[in-house]
Amino acid sequence: LKPDDLDSRMFLGDLTFYIHQAGERFALRMKDKNSRLRQEFAGLRWYPIDPAWRVSAHFVPYLSPREVPIEGILGDRSTLPMAGYVTFDLHGSYYKLEGLQDDDGRLFFIFNDLTRKTDTYQVRFLFSTPPANGTVELDFNEAYNPPCAFNPYTTCPLPTPGNRLQVEIPAGEKRYH
């Protein structure tokens, strides 16, 4: 396969097939417009937006991306290139998150927090603003669930031990069921 082939889709009735690449692995994925999961889906649920969960963070870039081992929700393992980490203050305590950097310069965080026990999925994703003068903005109101929160057949990366925050962050997307 070539990178251009990854956008190819094939249709068969209500089914859509496409190639998904995760690291060096390829998978054939299928979407079914009439699946039970889709029919029973009642919509997304979010915490009310709260400006208190928008924080400035100090970004510390690595000299070169650091390959970090990541475990997937289905037990698979891969590595991801972490660009650096951010430190930030929440209610008087400091926290740290490692993140990847996308082509637009934004940082991408795979994290969880203590709300995973009651209200949120066990992993959430969050983008920051691109770093400017060593600072990024984290808006936890925009934290969202990965695909595996909705479909047990989807693989997703789990947070590294350092990205499992020992604080409740009641902001962003909740579990949908």
Where is each model-derived feature located?
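Mid-length scaffold segments of soluble, non-membrane domains
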Residues: 77-120
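Short acidic/polar mixed-charge low-complexity motifs
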Residues: 15, 24, 91-95, 134
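Short acidic-hydrophobic surface loop/beta-edge motif
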Residues: 8-12, 86-89
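A mature extracytoplasmic/lumenal domain signature
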Residues: 32, 59, 101, 113-115, ...
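Forkhead-associated
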Residues: 1-3
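A short, sequence-level motif marking secondary-structure junctions
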Residues: 22-25, 98-106, 124-130
